[in-house]
């Protein structure tokens, strides 16, 4: 339309440089920088480009002498053209400051900032100060957001569109303001009343109108579904799906499913999905118009009037507008054929005002391959990680990072194995170079996939000199020592070693050498387990130490045929000689203990995979076998102790030699029996003493008994009498008298006979004291130090006598008074009655403490409600069998004596001990801690199904105190959940949950289907 009341002007800077506008085209749209192309004229033919380029300028559309529209911006392009009679032509492009962001690109990281915060920082960096944010919804912080080489403008638009933000511009004479908002419906409406529609031909209307209106509807995506994955909640698919609006005129089954959804928190999933759907349906209902009302501005709604179709006379919002205008100079300045006058028209795309229009989402930049980075952390630290083993890194491209713990977010590290509380773990250490890849090529999802050596991190051994060595070598934390697993593949000299610098401890296997880097001097073949510190070898089911040959592991690892044969032969010899001695008045031989030990060695490997068809195994015995002999030597002392018997058998000779003393003590009998040879007891230098301190000594021989003293005398003394007998004759010395009796002759031969008065000679007889035989036993824990007080015990004496009691505060039994030493067996025992008593007391105390709570119920407002994630986690196990709205999580003790790491759930609420408090969402915790949550939710389930968890739990804890673990269970055929106590039920449900999440539902069902067949609807 040509209008004499229209005028276009343009000035640069502070109005010091003005141009005549010949033509202009302004293209502006929601979520796009505007572009104003101007064709200008000036009577100046040598304008300094410095005065124009990159300077602010203002275009004004005047109507009826008043400014109807301003467009303010920055000059991006300036061209000087041809000159006419008095004027020179120029061309110019005016854009917003936002367009300058397209000129800059960067590699950088934003951490823990929301998108509105990132956009604000980005614009401030470019000095876009006329900026207004209108935020009506929550925008969650992004833990990690990377600008991966894309332009600042692309980053701005990508983040804004992902978060459902739209932007447009508002103008005045001196500035243009960028307006950004997450709601479009509440934005500006144009001033000056409704926009008129007129179907009259262009140019026939006395006032600005829209003279063309075309309305269209397009079939577009009807539903948007998205999923994403978070390792913190691996069982939750984070699926969100939304249906579009105004689907009356199209099918509703057109679904777009996108993965990944590019969100890591469920709270961001819905708005992300909503924004994406709105972007796909941005032109589902659209109108195309043309006219000459300059008030149409993208983002500013207007009311339409005058259209013959009533429902089109509604509120509309322009999303794109193209303005064109011409303003030609007078004939005296141009050619005679130059057009005259002013014209202006526009074309626009509209959407209904109530449509929350969004642009199509922009793709994230893809990183096509892995990158190199360096692990970083706090100053003075060597290892810096979180509970997931994640680390922080410094990328070479990051100019803003400071090589510290703030350089990046926590980044996950790929490990060789990663199971539920099992797997491989090697945390990259500060200063190490790592390879960082990106999940789905997403720059915001880095993951460490490998490590590499470099100039500052050299391999453990110099290469290629020691290329035959393979090793896993660690470094002492804040130290210089190491642990190492080394494999040496040197030809004909292969070996392996597991080593620790602490105590120079190592297990060497194969061809043993000194370290290769130090020359590799041979030091043996086979294996060596050594340490400069202490060592121990333990085997709970038995241990075989043998030098019997077994080439290439050709038999079972407990092959003990030779040692069993030797033990059987020794047992047979001991039994034969012992029985013979017993039959000939020797001390009886008890072969049963030796036989028991021999059988234990015989059965040592029973139950193992190569002896599975036999018994379940013998006792945990140690068997030593050396075909060439066993030597034990020490320059100090050697002690051999046995709680029962020591049996020493030699098929030939047993020789005991001591440089000084040989001392043999026995609490009962000592028997020496030589079956076929001599028994000699000789003291070469000192005296020989043979005593029977409380009984008799008998010297008996089938032939002769000889008593002699080579140098001095033989003295025979007795307190009562001495009698010598032979062949019926006798001599008795008694009471100071001598009595001779004989059946035959009495012959006295002497050179002289002397008969004098009475005389006597007294000899001092030895005195024999009774030894101390009373004893008291002390019961101690396995550590040998901690006493066991108040433990019931039973002592069984060798004669069958039984003594019962309870240990005192020091763990001691009562004093046992016996006349002689006895063998005794001590047993600890549990009694049911104390457990029942304590259980009753515990239940009574628990009931007394909580009687008010039992009567009135727990405070329904205390603590916090379950989160959405916690409910979802619990529903995966309990379904809808729990009223989740009544469950409260309380960071407080239920009873004063609740332990710091204990959790109680006695009344439908869960009470956390001090060390377990402060968890915002248990569904985001580790799998094992989620298992704890499921265990406690089982008590909530029990409570809601009628179980008095408080009283039953008190009884159970009493049994736990006295009788041991009440949590351990064994799944048995035919038993369901009701056949187990409440703590076992909690552990069963927890283990079902863990197995389901670790190995899959099929595995969990195969193990727990029987016990949980009525669960969760009942027991």
UniProtKB/Swiss-Prot annotation:
Enzyme class, first EC level, given as a word: hydrolase
Cellular localisation: Secreted
Name the GO cellular-component terms: extracellular region; type VI protein secretion system complex
Per the UniProt entry, the Enzyme Commission number(s) are 3.4.24.-
Query: Mind telling me which InterPro entries this protein's record contains?
Result: Gp5/Vgr_OB, T6SS_Rhs_Vgr_dom, T6SS_RhsGE_Vgr_subset, T6SS_Vgr_RhsGE, T6SS_VgrG/RHS, Vgr_OB-fold_dom_sf, VgrG2_DUF2345
Q: Where is the active site?
A: 936
Q: Where is this region: Disordered?
A: 268-291
Q: Which domain of life is it from?
A: Bacteria
Spell out the molecular function terms from Gene Ontology. hydrolase activity; metal ion binding
Enumerate the cofactors the protein uses: Zn(2+)
In terms of PROSITE patterns, this protein maps to: ZINC_PROTEASE
Subunit architecture? Interacts with Tla3; this interaction promotes Tle3 loading onto VgrG2b. Interacts with host gamma-tubulin ring complex components GCP1 and GCP4.
* Reported function: Part of the H2 type VI secretion system (H2-T6SS) specialized secretion system, which delivers several virulence factors in both prokaryotic and eukaryotic cells during infection. Forms the spike at the tip of the elongating tube probably formed by haemolysin co-regulated protein 2b/Hcp2b. Allows the delivery of the Tle3 antibacterial toxin to target cells where it exerts its toxicity. Additionally, acts directly as an effector and promotes internalization by interacting with the host gamma-tubulin ring complex.
- What is the name of this protein? Type VI secretion system spike protein VgrG2b
């Amino acid at each position: 339309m040509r209008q004499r009341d229209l005028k276009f002007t343009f000035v640069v800077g502070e109005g010091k440089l003005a141009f005549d506008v010949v033509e202009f085209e302004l293209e502006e749209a929601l979520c796009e920088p505007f572009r104003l192309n101007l064709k200008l004229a000036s009577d100046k033919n040598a304008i300094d480009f410095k005065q124009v380029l990159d300077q602010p300028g203002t275009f004004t559309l005047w109507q009826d002498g008043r400014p109807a529209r301003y467009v303010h911006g920055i000059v991006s392009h300036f061209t000087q053209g041809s000159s006419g009679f008095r004027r020179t032509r120029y061309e110019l492009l005016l854009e917003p400051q936002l367009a300058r962001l397209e000129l800059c690109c960067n590699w950088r990281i934003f951490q823990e900032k929301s998108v509105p915060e990132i956009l604000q920082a980005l614009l401030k960096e470019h000095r876009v100060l006329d900026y207004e944010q209108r935020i009506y919804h929550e925008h969650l912080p992004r833990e990690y957001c990377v600008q991966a080489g894309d332009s600042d403008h692309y980053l701005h638009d990508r983040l804004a569109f992902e978060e459902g933000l739209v932007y447009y511009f508002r103008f005045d004479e001196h500035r243009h303001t960028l307006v950004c908002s997450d709601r479009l419906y509440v934005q500006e409406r144009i001033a000056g009343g409704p926009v008129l529609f007129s179907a009259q031909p262009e140019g026939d209307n006395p006032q600005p109108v829209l003279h063309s209106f075309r309305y269209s509807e397009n079939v577009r995506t009807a539903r948007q579904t998205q999923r994403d994955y978070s390792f913190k909640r691996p069982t939750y698919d984070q699926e969100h799906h939304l249906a579009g609006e105004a689907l009356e005129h199209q099918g509703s089954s057109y679904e777009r499913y996108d993965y990944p959804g590019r969100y890591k928190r469920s709270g961001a999933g819905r708005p992300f999905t909503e924004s994406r759907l709105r972007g796909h349906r941005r032109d589902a209902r659209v109108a195309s118009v043309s006219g000459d009302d300059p008030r149409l501005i993208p983002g500013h709604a207007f009311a339409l009037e005058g259209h013959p179709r009533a429902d089109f006379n509604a509120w509309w919002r322009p999303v794109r507008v193209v303005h064109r205008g011409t303003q030609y100079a007078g004939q005296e300045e141009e050619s005679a054929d130059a057009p005259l006058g002013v014209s202006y028209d526009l074309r626009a795309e509209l959407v209904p005002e109530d449509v929350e229009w969004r642009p199509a989402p922009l793709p994230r930049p893809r990183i096509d391959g892995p990158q190199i980075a360096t692990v970083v952390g706090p100053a003075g630290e060597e290892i810096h990680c979180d509970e997931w083993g994640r680390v922080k890194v410094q990328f070479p491209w990051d100019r803003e990072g400071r090589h510290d713990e703030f350089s990046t977010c926590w980044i996950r590290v790929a490990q060789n194995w990663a199971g539920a509380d099992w797997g491989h773990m090697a945390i990259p250490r500060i200063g190490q170079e790592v390879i960082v890849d990106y999940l789905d090529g997403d720059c915001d999802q880095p993951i460490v996939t490998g490590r590499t050596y470099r100039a500052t991190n050299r391999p453990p051994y110099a290469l290629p000199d020691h290329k035959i060595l393979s090793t896993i070598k660690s470094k002492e934390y804040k130290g210089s020592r190491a642990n190492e697993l080394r494999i040496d593949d040197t030809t004909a000299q292969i070996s392996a070693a597991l080593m620790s610098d602490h105590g120079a401890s190592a297990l060497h296997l194969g061809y043993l050498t000194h370290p290769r880097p130090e020359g590799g001097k041979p030091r043996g073949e086979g294996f060596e387990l050594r340490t400069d510190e202490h060592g121990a070898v333990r085997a709970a089911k038995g241990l075989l130490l043998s030098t019997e040959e077994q080439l290439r592991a050709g038999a079972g690892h407990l092959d003990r045929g030779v040692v069993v044969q030797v033990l059987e032969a020794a047992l047979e010899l001991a039994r034969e000689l012992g029985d013979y001695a017993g039959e000939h008045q020797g001390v009886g031989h008890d072969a049963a203990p030796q036989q028991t030990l021999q059988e234990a060695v015989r059965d040592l490997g029973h139950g193992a995979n190569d002896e599975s068809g036999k018994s379940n195994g013998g006792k945990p015995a140690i068997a030593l076998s050396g075909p060439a002999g066993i030597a034990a030597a020490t320059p100090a002392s050697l002690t051999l102790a046995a709680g029962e018997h020591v049996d020493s058998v030699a098929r030939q000779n047993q020789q005991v030699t001591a440089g000084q003393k040989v001392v043999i003590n026995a609490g009962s009998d000592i028997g020496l029996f030589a079956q076929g040879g001599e028994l000699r007891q000789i003291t070469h230098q000192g005296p020989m003493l043979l005593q029977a301190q409380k009984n008799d000594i008998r010297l008996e021989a089938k032939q002769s008994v000889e008593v002699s003293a080579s140098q001095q005398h033989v003295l025979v003394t007795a307190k009562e009498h001495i009698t010598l007998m032979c062949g019926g004759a006798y001599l008795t010395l008694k009471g100071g008298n001598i009595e001779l009796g004989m059946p035959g002759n009495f012959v006295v031969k002497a050179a002289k006979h002397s008969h004098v008065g009475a005389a006597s000679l007294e000899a001092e007889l030895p005195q024999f004291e009774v030894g101390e035989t009373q004893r008291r036993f002390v019961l101690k824990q396995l550590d040998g130090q901690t006493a066991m007080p108040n433990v019931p015990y039973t002592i069984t004496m060798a004669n069958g006598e039984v003594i019962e009691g309870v240990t005192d505060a020091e763990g001691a039994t009562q004093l046992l008074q016996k006349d002689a030493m006895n063998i005794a067996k001590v047993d600890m025992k549990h009694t049911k009655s104390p457990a029942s008593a304590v259980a009753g007391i515990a239940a009574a105390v628990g009931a007394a403490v909580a009687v008010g709570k039992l009567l009135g119920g727990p405070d329904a407002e205390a603590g916090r409600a379950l989160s959405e994630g916690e409910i979802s986690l619990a529903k995966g196990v309990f379904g809808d069998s729990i009223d989740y709205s009544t469950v409260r999580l309380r960071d407080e003790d239920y009873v004063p004596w609740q332990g710091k790491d204990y959790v109680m759930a006695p009344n439908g609420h869960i009470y956390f001990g001090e060390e377990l408090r402060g968890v915002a969402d248990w569904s985001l915790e580790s799998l094992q801690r989620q298992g704890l949550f499921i265990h406690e939710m089982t008590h909530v389930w029990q409570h809601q199904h009628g179980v008095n968890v408080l009283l039953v739990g008190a009884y159970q804890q009493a049994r736990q105190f006295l009788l041991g673990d009440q949590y351990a269970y064994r799944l048995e055929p035919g038993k369901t959940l009701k056949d187990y106590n409440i703590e076992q039920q909690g552990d069963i449900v927890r283990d079902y949950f863990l197995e389901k999440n670790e190995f899959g539902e099929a595995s969990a069902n195969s193990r727990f289907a029987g016990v949980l067949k009525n669960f969760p609807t009942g027991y």
